[in-house]
Amino acid sequence: MGQDRINREERRDMDFQKNQLLTTEIIDISTEGEGIGKVNGYPFFIKDTIIGDQVEIRAIKLKKNYGYGRLEKVITPSPFRVTPSCCFHRQCGGCQIQAMSYEQQLAFKHNKVRNNLLRIGGFGPEELDRIMEPVVGMEEPFRYRNKAQYPIGMDKEGNPVAGFYAGRTHSIIANTECLLGVDENRTILEAILQYMKEYSISAYEEASGKGLVRHVLIRKGFTSGEIMVCLVINPEHMKGRTGIREKNSKREWLPHQKELIERLVAIRGMTSISVSINCEKTNVIMGTEIHTLWGKERITDTIFVRDVDNCFARTGDGIAFSISPLSFYQVNPVQTEKLYSLALSYAGLSGKESVWDLYCGIGTISLFLSGRASKVYGVEVVPQAIEDAKQNAANNGITNAEFFAGKAEEVLPGFYGRKDAVSHSAGSTEQGREGMFHPDVIVVDPPRKGCDEMCLDTMLKMAPDRIVYVSCDSATLARDLRILCDGGYELKRVRPVDMFPQTVHVESVVLMQYCGK
């Protein structure tokens, strides 16, 4: 009897049956955007729900310690529930919390960062209440994305469609009117789809690997107004056409290419039209070979410094960036200005400091820092991004930023490990050597997995006065902050930034001060 009771407690799913109807209240949101509700202590994950909803669900999957439910109906809506602006929000799944008021979205994201710092980082609630600042939100939390990638397919009637993949599937939800993208996206897509229909241009079919048009990439410079369109194509479908894979071939890459170009050029702001060659059976969108069909190879955009103490008003200081179809560039330029201006403010630069910028991408933060630092060293693993960073520095007349290609966890320890040899090398000044091996500030902006352990260890050995951590994942942020604090640093300021309204994602900027071991 006792063993039966123990087994039953261990397997709480035994209290439920698949397809059983249950009621619950949503008490939290998961990292994937699913609502979390408990029934007799057993948690269910339920899509399309928000905190505060009283819902009826159907149990669709039962695991040992948690299950998944499908929303059947909202019994009592949350006071934070609003009518979503997009009619595709449930099918698409890209905007997991669009049914939540924007004010509550910001509160949710603040709590998400705080809870991870509490639970994973082990920081005290009183400390966090003292150092955490309000989430930086958007005045207009729609139409903020400067980049969109639309898969192209065929509907049941054989007509070309563009849209987005339904959650966790490869089924395209036809939608040319995503409310996160710019207004021009719809006009561009409709022109391409009409061209495909009129000239019987095939869409790529993943199962067979046949078909020509795979994706459409659209980028827009918010300050310049310049628009780039890149069609990702599968030219193996056009076997027999000589020269189809010749670099810079003057042959047409698309049937009736001239007609498509004429339609796209008529759209205001059109600056660049190109194709990306991707013949692989892969879910990677872009190919590595780009051919410009019309206009420039790149578009430009300018990121301005903002005054964080004056409601984030623009200061007039800006950095211009050159953007190719393959460039990494933050997709929300309005919030990017606020995010990087916070990082610049937290760095506390006076013009005399040396700074390392780790995971620097195309140099966005590095070039922001260069205007107020003596020297900036940027590190990025993607060689093309480093080439872009160097070119962006040259385009802006910046001479005090130096960039290195490689993994931060290899480049930084490599430099530090060779400090004695470099210190005695000809041509290196004492001030330059000191700044490189003992910087005043280190800025890190790692991917979701956070900083590598070797990188963190070297940062602690370098012992900069300040570390500014820009994070896109508050769980790995909390883990890394604990390591740095155990190594002699103290949290000074934490501020979340809403880079992706209508989604569960949140970025953060953190200032740490060295206080000794």
Where are the language model's segments positioned?
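Rossmann-like S-adenosyl-L-methionine
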Residues: 2-23, 31, 237-517
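Short, acidic/hydrophobic/Gly-rich beta-strand patch recurrent on exposed beta strands
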Residues: 35-40, 163-166, 230-232, 389
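Structural signature of eukaryotic scaffold interfaces centered on beta-propeller domains
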Residues: 219-221
